[in-house]
Amino acid sequence: MRRCSVAKRRALALLLCLLLLLCTACGGQAQEDAGALHCTVRIECSTVLAHMDDLKAGKADIVPSDGVLLPETTVAFSEGDTVFDVLQQVCRAQGIHMESTWTPAYNSAYIEGIGNLYEFDCGELSGWMYSVNGVWPDYGCSGYTLHDGDTVVWSYTCDLGRDVGALQGEPLTIPSRRCTRR
């Protein structure tokens, strides 16, 4: 009786090994990735290094010494994915804190903070901007659909984009904060 039990165990073990071999040969990451598109993503805040005096108290420790939160990283994405989708994906995968809100007026996500560095942390003109292939889109990141081979750079600006090359010679318009009483 015991002999039958040992034979059954061996047969079951062999069957499990064959199933595992079959699953790894047919499935796995390589096949999932085969039809995927790819882009590169970089997240940097090097402009803050020149404005450390303007940085909010307690924020100096979160700024990397080289200003790079995420070096250029290749990311697989699907057809129709946006810059926002890929930012969420890479931040989740790399353990980088990212916070956003939906802005109905622009029908897009607005990035409030990445790596615990938020808008206005380095002055009233500071915040996150993105470029794709060296171009700074004038619309939200969830409105930009990526293409295979795109290069996305998220940059923290301390001067409404001038310090990262987004506003080259364009006039700067800041809404008035004055209130008038009637």
Language-model regions: role of each:
Residues R2, A7-R10, L21-R182:
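Ubiquitin-like/PB1-type beta-grasp interaction modules and other compact soluble beta-rich domains
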Residues L12-L15:
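Short linear motifs in low-complexity or flexible loops
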